[in-house]
Regions:
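Compositionally biased, disordered extreme N-termini, encompassing classical targeting presequences
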Residues: 1-9, 36, 90-94
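Local sequence-structure signature of Cys/Sec-based thiol-disulfide redox active-site neighborhoods
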Residues: 2-31
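Generic recognition of short, well-ordered alpha-helical segments
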Residues: 22-26, 51, 76
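Short polybasic/polar patches that bind polyanions
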Residues: 33, 54
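Thiol-based oxidoreductase modules, predominantly thioredoxin-like and allied folds used
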Residues: 37-49
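Structural micro-motif
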Residues: 56-65
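Non-catalytic, surface beta->alpha helical segment in thiol-disulfide oxidoreductase systems
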Residues: 66-94
């Protein structure tokens, strides 16, 4: 379909008792209402979470990956993520 956005695969690395992780979940929930995203949450303490964090250079939670590439860690900027999702939408429309 013309103009349809391709879903972005989002992986959120979290840990227990992490207020920044809760903030990131809220940001992703808001943006998921506007953009096609598939969100997977991984515990940073899991073997898969540790491996992904090491691969992506994630120093502390929350870590965010977009389509397998590291996007951010620490406090997630809604503005920065929105700009990136807009950019990806524009590139799929060309």
């Amino acid at each position: 379909m013309t103009g349809q956005m391709v879903a972005v695969e989002v992986v959120l690395l979290t840990q227990n008792h992490c207020s920044l992780c809760e903030h990131a979940k809220q940001v992703l929930d808001r943006l998921a209402a506007e953009y096609p995203v598939r969100i997977t949450t991984l515990d940073l303490a899991s073997s898969e979470g540790r491996a992904l964090a090491a691969h992506g250079g994630i120093l502390f939670p929350p870590g965010v990956f977009l389509d397998g590439e590291p996007f951010s860690y620490g406090r997630l900027s809604e503005r920065k993520l929105r700009r990136e999702l807009d950019r990806r939408h524009q590139s799929t429309r060309r």
